[in-house]
Amino acid sequence: MASAGSTARRAGSGSWHSERGEGRGARPQPTPSGSMQQANKVSLKATWTDAESKQPSQPLPDLADHLSAQATALARPRRPASLTPPRADPSPSKESDQTAIDQTAIGSYYQLFAAAVGNVEWLRFCLNQSLREIPTDDKGFTAIHFAAQWGKLACLQVLVEEYKFPVDLLTNNSQTPLHLVIHRDNTTVALPCIYYLLEKGADLNAQTCNGSTPLHLAARDGLLDCVKVLVQSGANVHAQDAMGYKPIDFCKIWNHRACARFLKDAMWKKDKKDFAREMTKMKMFKSQLTLMEHNYLIEYQKEHKILREAAIRKWLHGKLHPGHSLVSNTKQARATALSKTPEQRESQRSRSFHPSVDARLQCIPQPTEMPKPIYRKPTVKRPTMWNVSNNPARPPTTQISHSQGIRLGVHPDPTPEHDFSSFLEVRPDGHGGARLHTVDGHWVAPVPRLPFEVLLRMLYPRVWPYRMKVPQGFYPISMREVPRKRHLGDNTFWTDTLAMNLRDTFDEAFLAAVRSHQGLPTLPSPQTNP
């Protein structure tokens, strides 16, 4: 009866439903009813079948009273329609229906009770006698929630594998069994239950009504082993609750230093991994932008060539008629300018920003296709005989001369990166990222999820010099602004104070020297012991 006694103590210490994030409330008072009296009578006859309880058990005072009240609540709102036919007058059939309802409430009461105490045989018996629907109490707790709350792994296995209970079944506060199993009272039994629920597909990042994830609860209670299991299984270390707190914030609030160190290291690794992945995407993104700019400049060059040829033909056509006056040419040019469409005007305006298209095409690296691998039959090369002659004219001729260049550094010079400042306009999106807009009026998406400064430095390398990346915040200052020490001369009292601090005793010669220099300083009066 050890487990039953411990269950009774835990039930008396707080509410039967530990809301995990909302606090433990007061224990509800039992509701006397006829069905509950019958349930208490049956509980007096029930015997434990587990190895830990072989003797007949008395009903647990606090736990039984609470579950009796829950059974009363179960009997009222979840009354099946088939068991309560509408009748105007009392009849024996109505009494039989009420008896069936009472039996259903008793079955639900014992089902939750068996799951909480961990009696597998009793739980199977109650589940076989109950209806097909899953009974719940007034807070939405079912048998799988009670089994998870008290860390009963055997009951969890029976409910999930034999009776197909969902592992992510929600309560009224959107709590899952994985939320309920993580608690400081379940330190010794929480890990096996967590491993089992994760194996069965439990949601790692499920959030309650206040936005708490299982990792938030483990970090708040300082359960380092649970935190490690959740993080290694893929829990989101940057998840925020309704108040914007992360799991590491709860570690700081409750002074769980070990959990805070582990979460800080996990967050750093996650950030670096995400940054490396986005930088890989950025390389592919820049190659796509280069191809887009190359195609745009080719189309622009073709359009510019067509317009230039049309202008030349128009000029030649005007030269073939020397009789018309300059006024007619001016009117014709004005009419031609007015007849242009807005698209042509915009094209002409955008061309003014590109004075040299050919030069830009030469600067853009040509998009190259990946060479196809060509299989070549390996050839076997036999080593040649060593030339034993000391005549340098005989083949193979020895070549020892080589033009040696002068290097000014150890590392190779970085290749110049292409600048997209004349093709792209980078704007902040308000969330730390950037939005890209081309000169031809198109938005580029999707953009790698990188900070705005990183995107600006990658796309505008001329604006952000390469050597100014590290150290951050390095800038030249004037020597006049450098803080300097104050010059201490002979007339400064500081020298006398230093000399007085270095002496153990003040003899007459020393006091005379200090008095002749600037005078004796004001010494603090000695404190007398009361």
Swiss-Prot record:
**GO biological process: one example:** mitotic metaphase chromosome alignment
- State a single Pfam family of this protein: Ank
- Polar residues composition-biased segments: 32-41, 326-341, 386-402
For this protein, the record's SMART domains field holds: ANK
Swiss-Prot/TrEMBL keywords: ANK repeat, Cell cycle, Cell division, Cytoplasm, Cytoskeleton, Mitosis, Phosphoprotein, Repeat
Tree of life domain = Eukaryota
Q: What is its main location?
A: cytoplasm
Summarizing the function annotation, the protein's role is:
Required for normal progression through mitosis. Involved in chromosome alignment and cytokinesis via regulation of microtubules polymerization.
Enumerate the PANTHER family for this protein.
ANKYRIN REPEAT DOMAIN-CONTAINING PROTEIN 53
The protein's name: Ankyrin repeat domain-containing protein 53
Q: What is the lineage of its organism?
A: Eukaryota, Metazoa, Chordata, Craniata, Vertebrata
Name the encoding gene, please: ANKRD53
